[in-house]
């Protein structure tokens, strides 16, 4: 798949505010992941979970399956895919060339030539040519960075368009709880979980755009709204596969 020639500046942080940077070194990428593990419950298992789910999907189980990592960030999902399924043909997209460079550097540092054979594209998903469909996709902490002003639907529609019929995608995002007696407790517990990680330099996080994307400028939606959006985009009903406080992961399948 190739990016279309007309490349637009991503509005409001593009795929997610987590990915808009000027430069990001391998050291900074590793720091991002360490802090994400402290702030997001279950973060350290998300890449392993996502790859395992796609590896057992009807299309992803096939040798040489084509997998898209939308908003590849610091490369956690790419590393795990190389560990579990070295036969997969991977495409990594991110609107930030600096983030792509950091992910490539990380794969080289941790797995030697693991970055070879990956198609790297600094583009938005919406600008990706959909002439050839992927067998599966991962989009972790991406949708939460898009406002619900049509941006979420455009992203999901482009995601469905990029997949072959029957292809599956894992979404993981901060969600807005439905009205319940326990919802306030879940939100309070998330803050307590983050505080229990120990002192973090709030000033440094506030001035660090990718880290700020973990706690600010997010646009969570409820499960009923997500269900409506994925249906409009051409996906099956969301199947819950992960939940840790108010972070949720769902598996979607593109309908024929």
How should each PLM-predicted stretch be described?
Residues 139-143, 171:
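A short beta-strand submotif of the Rossmann-like class I SAM-dependent methyltransferase core
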Residues 128-137:
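A short acidic, Gly/Pro-enriched loop at the edge of an enzyme's catalytic core
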Residues 174-232:
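C-terminal alpha-helical "lid/dimerization" subdomain adjacent to the S-adenosyl-L-methionine
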Residues 153-165:
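A short glycine-rich, Lys/Arg-flanked "PGG" loop and its adjoining helix->strand segment in the class I
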Residues 66-70, 74-127:
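Class I SAM-dependent methyltransferase SAM/SAH-binding core
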Residues 166-173:
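Conserved beta-strand signature within the Rossmann-like core of class I S-adenosyl-L-methionine
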């Amino acid at each position: 798949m190739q990016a279309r020639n007309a490349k637009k500046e991503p509005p409001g942080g593009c795929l997610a505010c987590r990915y808009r940077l000027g430069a990001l070194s391998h050291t900074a990428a590793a720091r991002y992941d360490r802090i994400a593990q402290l702030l997001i419950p279950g973060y350290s298992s998300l890449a392993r979970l996502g790859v395992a789910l796609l590896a057992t999907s009807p299309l992803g189980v096939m040798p040489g399956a084509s997998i898209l990592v939308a908003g590849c960030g610091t490369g956690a999902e790419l590393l795990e895919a190389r560990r579990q399924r070295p036969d997969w043909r991977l495409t990594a997209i991110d609107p930030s060339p600096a983030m792509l460079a950091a992910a490539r550097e990380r794969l080289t540092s941790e797995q030697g030539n693991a970055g070879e054979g990956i198609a790297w594209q600094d583009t938005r998903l919406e600008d990706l040519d959909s002439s050839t469909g992927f067998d599966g996709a991962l989009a972790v902490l991406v949708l939460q960075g898009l406002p619900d002003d049509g941006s979420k639907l455009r992203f999901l529609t482009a995601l469905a368009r990029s997949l072959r019929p029957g292809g599956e995608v894992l979404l993981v995002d901060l969600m807005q709880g439905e009205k319940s007696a326990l919802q306030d407790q879940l939100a309070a517990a998330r803050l307590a979980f983050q505080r229990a990680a120990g002192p973090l330099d709030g000033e440094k996080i506030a001035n660090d755009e990718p880290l700020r994307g973990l706690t600010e400028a997010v646009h969570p939606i409820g499960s009923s709204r997500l269900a409506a959006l994925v249906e409009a985009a051409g996906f099956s009903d969301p199947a819950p596969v992960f939940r840790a406080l108010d972070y949720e992961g769902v598996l979607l399948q593109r309908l024929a």
